[in-house]
Regions:
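C-terminal motif of bacterial Sec signal peptides marking the signal peptidase cleavage site
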Residues: 38-42
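Bacterial signal peptide processing site
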Residues: 44-47
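Extracellular ectodomain segments of secreted/surface proteins
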Residues: 58-103, 117, 122
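Alpha/beta-hydrolase-fold serine-hydrolase catalytic core, especially in secreted/extracellular enzymes
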Residues: 60, 116-117, 123-126, 135-138, ...
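N-terminal cap/lid segment of alpha/beta-hydrolase-fold proteins
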Residues: 177-220
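Cap/lid segment of the alpha/beta-hydrolase catalytic domain
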Residues: 192, 197, 216-288
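Accessory cap/linker subdomain of secreted extracellular hydrolases
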Residues: 237-240, 248, 311-416, 483-557
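Alpha/beta-hydrolase fold nucleophile elbow
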Residues: 291-303
Length: 557
């Protein structure tokens, strides 16, 4: 792929390269890692509307690829196409196109709107071929082996394509861009109840979900949060940590498995535009449910599920209320190539595990569901042979390719229009300490609360931060004054001690004076607090040593 030198951001529309913070903040925040180190040492469209456009002045508009001059996709353009001429099932998605129904090793050629063949794939054992990366020069390669060139080529851009197969040419199909969304009725007609189920994406792929309500469905609606990742958020009866805590505090929770993971269909890849678009679709479909309070949802999650929130929010789902990402990165490429040196440590291991778990039956619980008769889960495993080995793929990208701008969070977070609560530790042993590069990229007119601290990867769920997290979700998702009941505190002490080794609990109910109904007053007091808060010397408390919680807090505007 056409590569740019590491760190060259001028051609991405960032004048003078990447900047982090206003000068007034920069001098003090730059010193924080040194001080901490010493302490440790001692909107949705409709079928007729035009495609959703980026706002004027959007710095990433040219990297959110859409088919030029085309209206929003019609219902007929969405989902699988049973093509009469070729006899194939052709599924155009967001910067992807999947073909099924061919014979093993049969040649499946993709041609552009000019009638030129741009890539030929040999179908896998199941008669499948998946187009996502296109070489500069037409080639014929075996599908599903991840051996497409990674230096000379590009992604599959949105637009009109056709498939050639067996001497026949298919009808036109439309590959979508992230911002080319389905109509409101597509989301409104989907129904989800308490428990396990599936939600349908704009390309017809189904993602597995697990809904957990805090009470009977008829007693709703409930404030609702979504946790979206490639781990096991939709595994029945085993919620991820963010969902578990939110459920304890009275929220309805929905765990959603990314495409190509768990029981979800589709081809897995790491943070690609299709995955971002799926997040939009999932948010809109979930928010349309009758049991969702205000028909808006928030998002929660740490690490993988935290990073995913930033990508999803950048697609601007109209019914997303707020996000609370924790322990995040600023760019997948730089995570794999920090300082231009290949990361053979955690990132390599993490990508290898993602590849393994995205294999058919790779998470064990999906196999259990198939054995119990879940035919949708079983059918969704068939396409897994087309999954890309992203570890090998990314290792070949020694230089930053321009097409990777679609995953560069420093370019995407300016598009986020919802309130954001973001936390991270400078010594994060897994995702690293680059997350502050995101801070000044957020829209200054949108509410944000950033908390930085010295500490480890899971500390976002520690007592030091979890009460702040709950306060944010209460104000911006639930629309309620935060108030943690005594019963919840009594039940939580042992959980915190088990996970953090220290006898701690939730913080005080800071807005109790505003109960029961002075919501506006409580929220005004919360909003008036500093947007950037640095928690200094966490773990240095002598009662006992290691207790999470700062000795000093530095506030920045």
């Amino acid at each position: 792929m056409h590569n740019a030198p590491y760190g060259d951001t001028a051609h991405f529309g960032i004048p003078g390269g990447i900047h982090m913070l206003h000068r007034r903040r920069l001098a003090m925040l730059a010193a924080v890692p040194l001080l901490v180190g010493s302490a440790l040492t001692a909107c949705s469209g409709n079928d007729d509307a035009a495609a959703k456009k980026a706002p004027a002045g959007d710095p990433v508009a040219k990297f959110v690829r859409t088919a030029p001059g085309m209206a929003a996709p019609s219902a007929a353009e969405l989902g699988p196409h049973e093509d009469e001429a070729t006899g194939l099932t052709i599924t155009p998605g967001v910067e992807t196109l999947t073909v099924t129904g061919a014979k093993k090793s049969a040649a499946v050629a993709l041609e552009n709107s000019d009638g030129q063949v741009i890539l030929t794939l040999l179908a896998d054992d199941e008669g499948q071929a998946h187009f996502a990366y296109i070489p500069d020069k037409p080639l014929t390669v075996q599908s599903g082996e991840g051996d497409l060139p990674t230096i000379d080529g590009d992604v599959l851009f949105p637009g009109i394509y056709r498939v050639r197969f067996g001497g026949k040419t298919s009808a036109d199909v439309r590959v979508l861009g992230v911002d080319e969304v389905a109509g409101d009725d597509f989301y409104a007609k989907q129904k989800l109840g308490d428990g396990f189920g599936y939600v349908t994406m704009r390309d017809g792929v189904t993602l597995s979900v697990d809904v957990s309500l805090p009470g009977p469905i008829e007693d709703g609606p409930y404030p609702t949060v979504v946790e979206y990742s490639g781990y096991s958020p939709s595994k029945p009866d085993e919620p991820q940590p963010g969902s578990m805590i939110a459920g304890l505090l009275g929220f309805a929770t929905v765990g959603v498995n990314m495409r190509g993971t768990g029981c979800s269909g589709g081809v897995f890849e790491v943070f690609n535009p299709a995955q971002q678009a799926d997040g939009y679709d999932a948010i809109e479909a979930i928010a349309a449910q009758s049991w969702v309070k205000g028909n808006k949802v928030g998002m929660v999650g740490l690490s993988y599920a935290g990073i995913a929130q930033l990508y999803v929010a950048s697609t601007r789902p109209p019914h997303l209320a707020a996000i609370a990402p924790q322990s995040v990165i600023d760019d997948p490429w730089r995570e794999q190539w920090p300082g231009g040196v290949y990361n053979g440590g955690f990132t390599k291991q993490w990508l290898e595990e993602r590849t393994r778990q995205a294999e058919a039956g790779g998470q064990s619980w999906d196999g259990e569901r198939i054995a119990k008769g879940d035919k949708t889960c079983g059918a969704n495993q068939l396409i897994r042979s087309q999954n890309l080995d992203f570890g090998k793929f990314g290792k070949a990208l020694v230089n930053f390719p321009p097409s990777a701008a679609a995953r560069f969070l420093q370019l995407l977070v300016p598009r986020i229009e919802v309130p954001t609560f973001l936390t991270g530790g400078y010594q994060d042993e897994q995702t690293g300490g680059r997350f502050p590069y995101l801070f000044n990229k957020f829209d200054p007119d949108t509410f944000h609360r950033f908390k930085l601290y010295n500490g480890h990867h899971p500390d976002g769920y520690s007592p030091m931060l979890i009460t702040d997290w709950y306060e944010f979700l209460s104000f911006y998702v639930a629309g309620e004054i935060p108030n943690i009941a005594d019963g919840i505190r009594q039940a939580s002490g042992s959980v915190f001690e088990e996970n953090f080794g220290i006898d701690q609990n939730f913080g005080e109910n800071r807005f109790a004076d505003h109960l029961p109904d002075d919501f506006e007053g409580a929220k005004a007091a919360y909003d008036a607090e500093s947007p950037v808060q640095v928690l200094v010397e966490s773990g240095a408390d002598t009662n006992p040593v290691g207790t999470t919680g700062e000795r000093v807090r530095w506030d920045f505007d």
